[in-house]
Structures are given as structure tokens and as C-alpha cells.
């Protein structure tokens, strides 16, 4: 996507730069960061700015705070980043308050300031222009490297870009990489191209499935969403997850697949249990024999073998959504095995962020995948063919 202004197109020399990062990382009950992939992903852009003699202001959100609370502070991020960069990170006590402004004003070349959680400012999620103006006033250049929030029109993502001309705003390396991968996947995939789609809800993936069908050679559907398709085919699915209002849509997708010559694969057996809990009794059953009152919570061994066979000749695989309730150990086997099989093959493997990235990390396969997206919702919207507000704001007008 060459019409997106790149960080490399900008004269950064000795400038004060604002980098919107995505440091929305998972933490345990003691606020220890349990996965720092998103922080590591931001490092190439930060280093590039430092190498150009910049002073750098970093900003991100963390979680969905209702109010200012130490639970959502970016302090742990500052500590982890300092360790990864082997460099002091100056931490602001607020976002656009006196502390942040003073520290921003006094920031010297080669120094890094991290602002406090952007969502401590109510205006951030409202795309408030006053907040954007305050943030913009601290710097000379704006860089967006937060792919994970590009599908949201927020102050630090969209409104802020209005205060910079094309010579002073652009996409960081991570954002560029994400967009390039997604657009190549959709426009020029090596074939056979297979999509593996899971997760609990059809509703969240409907648009992506519709957009993917004409582009893929085969489609595998697993996870909770598979039961709406099985029900549409006339199977009795017991108490399994069902989106009744989407049965017609599921049928349309199955018919469209048939008309396009795209083979759609659904589970042939499941791990069934009466309740979704670690200590519930469970058994493997064919999809047509789910006991009354029981629910399917993972794909069974026959489905795992079938799906392994389906992806064996793939040249490109796009995977978004787990195959079962992977958060509970006994229902995680299908997702973990899928991760192993996808990572072991020769195909270009692109993993949609969020839960799928968590599965891959848990399976220990992260290094074997070609690309793991840092954004769940954003990567889905790109595959759906939507223009992301944060990306649109960085397009060069000359090419329009």
C-alpha cells in the first residue's frame, strides 16, 4: 500500500516525535505483564527515531478504565520497555496535564517520555479534537504504530492527524508491516489459500467470511461458531452455542461456497460436556450424536485429523479464532493441535491477533508462524475489505 506515508518518507532529524503505540498488554492479578509481544513490536520504530536524533513521546491505552486507577497505569509498561531498550523511560503522571507538558517541553534528543494511559482522558475514545490538539502541540511529528487500534476513530489515532501535514505524519514499521501482510494476503496469496476461522460467534466474523469466500480455495470453520452452521445443515447440536438469528446467513455462506467451488469444512466430531468447566465430565462424540443438554466445547480427534489433511497442501493459511474454549485446559487440545499443524507446514501462515495469538503463544509455536498480527479487530476489518480510520488518515492525498 504505497500511498500510505511511511516513517521513512519523513525528515525526522532532531525532531520531537509522538509515537502512538499499542501497549495494551495482558497482566496478571499482580499487574505483571504476561505477554510483551506488543511492546517488543514497537521497538524498531522507537529505535529508528532515536537513531535520527529525535526526542520521543510514546502514548498508548491499556484496558478500558472507567476512571483513573493505578490498575490501568502504564508504569509496568515503562519498566518493561526500559529493560528491552536498556534505556531510561521518563514516565508522565498524566496525559495532557502539567506533569506531562513540563516533561515533554524539557525532553532532550535521545530521551523517551511515556504518557500515562490515554483512556484516562474521557475524550480519547470520543475522537475529541481538543484532546488531539493538546497532544499534537507537544511535538513536531506524528507516527502511528498502533495497528491494534487503527479500526477505531480515537483522538490519538484519527483526530490528531488533522494537526500535521503530510511531511510530518506517517506510519511506523509495525503498522506498515501489518497492512502489507493483509493486502498481499487478499490480493496475491500463494495457492492453495486456506482460511481457518473459529471463535465463538458467527456475528463477529460474518463480514470476513463473506469477503473471504471468493478469495480462498478452502474454508475451515471451527470453534463455537461452527454449531450455527451445523444447525443450519439440520444437525441436532444439544445445548451448544447457537445464534438462531444467523441460521439463514450461515446457509447463504454454505450455498455461496458451493456456487464458487470453495469446499467448506466443519467439525465431524466434538468434545462434549454438560457444562463449560474444567471438572465437567466429557466425551468425544460425532456431531450428529451430541447428547441432549450437552454442548460441544472443542473439536474432536477426527476433526483434528480431517483439518490436518485439509491444510496439508496449503501454500497460504490465514487463521482467526480458536477451535474451542481454549481458556479451559481440557477444551484447548483442538486449538493447540491446529496451531502445531499450521506452524509445522510450509505455508505462509498469518495469524489474526487476539485469542488466536494467545493460542499460538500457549502452544509454543509463535516463532514458527510467518506473521502474527498484533490486532484482532483491526486485522479482521482489513480482511473484510474495510478502510481503517487510523490508516486512512495517513494516506497521501496526491494519490487520490
UniProtKB/Swiss-Prot annotation:
E.C. code: 2.7.2.3
Top-level EC class as recorded in UniProt: transferase
A GO-annotated cellular component: cytosol
GO BP of this protein: gluconeogenesis; glycolytic process
Record key words, sorted: ATP-binding, Cytoplasm, Glycolysis, Kinase, Nucleotide-binding, Transferase
Known catalytic reactions: (2R)-3-phosphoglycerate + ATP = (2R)-3-phospho-glyceroyl phosphate + ADP
Binding-site positions, ATP: 205, 296, 327, 353-356
Biological pathway: Carbohydrate degradation; glycolysis; pyruvate from D-glyceraldehyde 3-phosphate: step 2/5
PROSITE patterns: PGLYCERATE_KINASE (PS00111)
One Gene Ontology molecular-function label: ADP binding
Coiled-coil residues: none
Primary localization: cytoplasm
Stored InterPro entries: Phosphoglycerate_kinase, Phosphoglycerate_kinase_CS, Phosphoglycerate_kinase_N, Phosphoglycerate_kinase_sf
UniProt-annotated binding residues for substrate: 22-24, 38, 61-64, 119, 152
Location within or outside the cell: Cytoplasm
Subunit record text: Monomer.
Similarity comment text for this entry: Belongs to the phosphoglycerate kinase family.
Name of the protein in question: Phosphoglycerate kinase
Underlying gene: pgk
Amino acid at each position: 500500500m504505497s500511498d500510505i506515508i511511511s516513517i521513512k518518507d519523513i525528515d525526522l532529524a532532531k525532531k520531537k516525535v509522538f509515537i502512538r503505540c499499542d501497549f495494551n498488554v495482558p497482566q496478571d492479578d499482580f499487574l505483571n505483564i504476561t505477554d510483551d509481544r506488543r511492546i517488543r513490536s514497537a521497538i524498531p520504530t522507537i529505535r529508528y527515531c532515536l537513531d535520527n536524533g529525535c526526542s520521543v513521546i510514546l502514548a498508548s491505552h491499556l484496558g478500558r478504565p472507567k476512571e483513573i486507577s493505578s490498575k490501568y497505569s502504564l508504569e509496568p509498561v515503562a519498566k518493561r520497555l526500559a529493560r528491552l531498550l536498556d534505556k531510561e523511560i521518563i514516565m508522565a503522571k498524566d496525559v495532557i496535564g502539567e506533569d506531562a507538558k513540563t516533561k515533554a517541553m524539557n525532553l532532550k534528543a535521545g530521551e523517551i517520555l511515556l504518557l500515562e494511559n490515554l483512556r484516562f482522558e474521557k475524550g480519547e475514545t470520543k475522537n475529541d479534537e481538543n484532546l488531539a490538539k493538546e497532544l499534537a502541540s507537544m511535538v513536531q511529528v506524528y507516527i502511528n504504530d498502533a495497528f491494534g487500534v487503527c479500526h477505531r476513530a480515537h483522538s490519538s489515532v484519527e483526530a490528531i492527524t488533522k494537526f500535521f501535514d503530510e511531511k510530518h505524519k506517517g506510519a511506523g514499521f509495525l503498522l506498515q508491516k501489518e497492512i502489507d501482510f493483509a493486502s498481499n494476503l487478499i490480493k496475491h496469496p500463494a495457492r492453495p489459500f486456506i482460511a481457518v476461522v473459529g471463535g465463538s460467534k458467527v456475528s463477529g466474523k460474518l463480514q470476513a467470511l463473506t469477503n473471504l469466500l471468493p478469495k480462498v480455495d478452502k474454508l475451515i470453520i471451527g470453534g463455537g461458531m461452527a454449531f450455527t452452521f451445523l444447525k443450519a445443515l439440520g444437525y441436532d447440536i444439544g445445548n451448544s452455542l447457537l445464534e438462531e438469528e444467523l441460521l439463514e446467513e450461515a446457509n447463504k455462506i454454505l450455498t455461496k461456497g458451493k456456487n464458487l467451488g470453495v469446499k467448506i469444512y466443519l467439525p465431524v466430531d466434538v468434545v462434549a460436556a454438560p457444562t463449560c468447566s474444567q471438572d465437567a465430565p466429557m466425551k468425544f462424540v460425532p456431531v450428529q450424536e451430541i447428547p441432549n443438554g450437552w454442548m460441544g466445547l472443542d473439536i474432536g480427534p477426527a476433526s483434528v485429523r480431517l483439518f490436518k489433511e485439509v491444510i496439508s497442501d496449503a501454500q497460504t493459511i490465514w487463521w482467526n479464532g480458536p477451535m474451542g474454549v481454549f481458556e479451559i485446559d481440557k477444551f484447548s487440545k483442538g486449538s493447540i493441535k491446529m496451531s502445531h499443524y499450521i506452524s509445522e507446514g510450509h505455508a505462509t501462515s498469518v495469524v489474526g491477533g487476539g485469542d488466536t495469538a494467545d493460542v499460538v503463544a500457549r502452544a509454543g509455536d509463535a516463532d514458527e508462524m510467518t506473521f502474527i498480527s498484533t490486532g484482532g479487530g483491526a486485522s479482521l476489518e482489513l480482511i473484510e475489505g474495510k478502510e481503517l480510520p487510523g490508516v486512512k488518515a495517513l494516506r497521501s492525498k496526491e494519490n487520490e
